[in-house]
A protein has these predicted regions:
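Helix-to-loop junction immediately C-terminal to a conserved catalytic motif
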Residues: 67
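Conserved ABC ATPase "signature" region
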Residues: 82-83, 123, 130-148
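Conserved signature/switch motifs of ABC ATPase nucleotide-binding domains
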Residues: 151-154, 172
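Catalytic Walker B motif of ABC-type/P-loop ATPase nucleotide-binding domains
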Residues: 177-180
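Helical segment within the ABC ATPase nucleotide-binding domain
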Residues: 192-205, 224-226, 237-240
Length: 278
């Protein structure tokens, strides 16, 4: 399988309605502990899938499977229809060029300034230096940090580091963004700023995403708000509206206990789910 997932092939598959992400009866365990048990779900183009569940339920492991950092024991993980299990390491590297990732820890290079951190992926792809600079400025402007371009991570607050991480994730205009607890460890005001940027990326760029959060408030804010480009920030959808492209996946003890819409989750009759979201 050569030149897997080049831009043209990816665009063709998106146009045909191929799911961006598909887990098909995925199981994964470490030694005798089964972490994920028969996980199946699909994520369509333009959809935001919010992944909820108690700590230790397998959420972060699921995210690593979606990026090919782990492979399942059984079942299949597909990105745009391509099976990750069938890829060589080179092909997995090519696949990751279509995936942006935002970690809770930000995972910035402390020895590089903001510009070089954001530019890192494009430099690895040998993009023209002038184009790299222009795209870095564009990405930093998106997260409202263009004035921090020459600063180093040690000079940034936790929230600013997280915003740089988002800029780095979006600079290659990926088909999929994986947000692993992007507001973890942040205060409520800073968390709201990060969610504002996630909603902005969803509504302005239409990027497909998986997002893990431990904050139910963040999840339901995303589902009930939209980004207003004229105002420059997100706003509540009028008349109790709900974003149609935001759906939920809830894991508990390694199993999918809910896969559906915001309304379906809000009106669930399942006792465990009702207690979890209350």
């Amino acid at each position: 399988m050569t030149e897997i997932m080049n831009d043209e092939q990816a665009a063709e598959r998106i146009a045909k309605g191929v799911p961006i992400v598909e887990f098909d009866h995925v199981c994964l365990g470490f030694e005798e502990h089964q972490v994920l048990k028969d996980i199946s779900f699909k994520v369509a183009h333009g959809e935001t899938r919010i992944i909820l569940g108690p700590s230790g339920g397998g959420k972060s492991v699921l995210m690593k499977l979606a990026n090919g950092l782990l492979l399942p024991d059984t079942g299949d993980v597909r990105i745009l229809g391509w099976s990750l299990q069938q890829m060589t390491q080179r092909e997995l590297f090519q696949m990751r060029a279509h995936v942006g990732m935002v970690f809770q820890e930000s995972a910035l290079f402390d020895s590089l300034n903001v510009e070089d951190n954001v530019a890192y992926r494009l430099e690895e792809e040998h993009v023209d230096p002038q184009e790299i600079h222009e795209r870095v400025v564009e990405a930093l402007r998106f997260v409202e940090l263009e004035k921090a371009i020459d600063k180093f991570p040690s000079e940034l607050s936790g929230g600013m580091r997280r915003r740089v991480s988002i800029a780095r994730a979006i600079i290659s205009k990926p088909d999929l963004i994986l947000y692993d607890s992007p507001t973890g460890g942040l205060d409520p005001i800073t968390s709201n700023t990060i969610i504002d940027l996630v909603v902005k990326q969803r509504d302005v760029s239409g990027t497909t995403s998986l997002l893990i959060t431990h904050r139910l408030q963040d999840a339901f804010t995303m589902a009930t708000h939209r980004y207003n480009e004229q105002l420059g920030h997100m706003e509540k959808i009028p008349n109790g509206g709900i974003d149609p492209n935001t759906r939920f996946l809830v894991l508990n003890e390694g199993k999918v206990v809910f896969d559906g819409t915001t309304l379906e989750l809000s009106h669930t009759s399942d006792p465990w789910l009702k207690d979890y979201i209350s």
